[in-house]
């Protein structure tokens, strides 16, 4: 190899080293320039087919995936499902009531994909007919509930410790299809931190090893 060839090799190596050194800075710059997610959903949701989302996460819904007669279009429910199904590592759910079959299937899909799912719920409402909590527990998902006098009335989810989903919506078919409700989906480090701290505080408080053996629980409205 001649002297000029060695110079080319040296220059290429130096260029590669500089590129690798600049890569972390470039990634930080790109991430800093990306707008954080801000999305507001309003309910009641249009009734649409969600089978394509629930059978093949990440694919857009379409008539080829399901022969049903429901519209195969975007809706508030499908957008909420997409936000949940974007989870790759963790999902924290803190929900007063959870009886929506579609949302229940989405949570089970995430569990099957290896996402760590933890659920906090209200002990009275988890026992109601149609609740998804029993199915989630049967699937091996960790669930904790309250044992005190007040309702566990929170309604929020945290996706990958980065995205907060919260609002007035109970995760029930009644609320999704009939009620005037709202859901905010947002990436905000400070808000996510505060909600995650609240989740961890309640998770520790609802540790079943700390329950009294004969709880005295009486609730009013």
From Swiss-Prot:
The chain crosses the membrane at residues 5-27. It is a single-pass membrane protein. It comes from the Eukaryota. It is found in: Mitochondrion outer membrane; Nucleus membrane; Cell membrane; Golgi apparatus. Disruption phenotype: Males are sterile, because of meiotic arrest during spermatogenesis due to demethylation and subsequent derepression of transposable elements. No spermatids were observed in the mutant testes, and no spermatozoon in the epididymis. Effects are caused by defects in primary piRNA biogenesis: in contrast to wild-type cells neither mitochondria nor associated meiotic nuage (named P granule) are aggregated. InterPro entries: PLD-like_dom, PLD_domain, PLipase_D/transphosphatidylase. Single stranded DNA (ssDNA) hydrolase activity does not depend upon, but is stimulated by the presence of Ca(2+) and Mn(2+). MIGA1 and MIGA2 increase PLD6 self-association affinity and affects the homodimer conformation facilitating its phospholipase activity over the nuclease activity. MYC induces its expression and stimulates its phospholipase activity. Residues 148-175 form the PLD phosphodiesterase domain. Keywords: Cell membrane, Differentiation, Endonuclease, Golgi apparatus, Hydrolase, Lipid degradation, Lipid metabolism, Meiosis, Membrane, Metal-binding, Mitochondrion, Mitochondrion outer membrane, Nuclease, Nucleus, Spermatogenesis, Transmembrane, Transmembrane helix, Zinc, Zinc-finger. PROSITE patterns: PLD. Residues 1-4 are mitochondrial intermembrane. Pfam families: PLDc_2. Residues 28-221 are cytoplasmic. A zinc finger (C3H1-type) spans 44-75. Its main location: mitochondrion. In contrast to other members of the phospholipase D family, contains only one PLD phosphodiesterase domain, suggesting that it has a single half-catalytic and requires homodimerization to form a complete active site. PANTHER family: CARDIOLIPIN HYDROLASE (PTHR43856), MITOCHONDRIAL CARDIOLIPIN HYDROLASE (PTHR43856:SF1). This is Mitochondrial cardiolipin hydrolase. It comes from Mus musculus. The gene is Pld6.
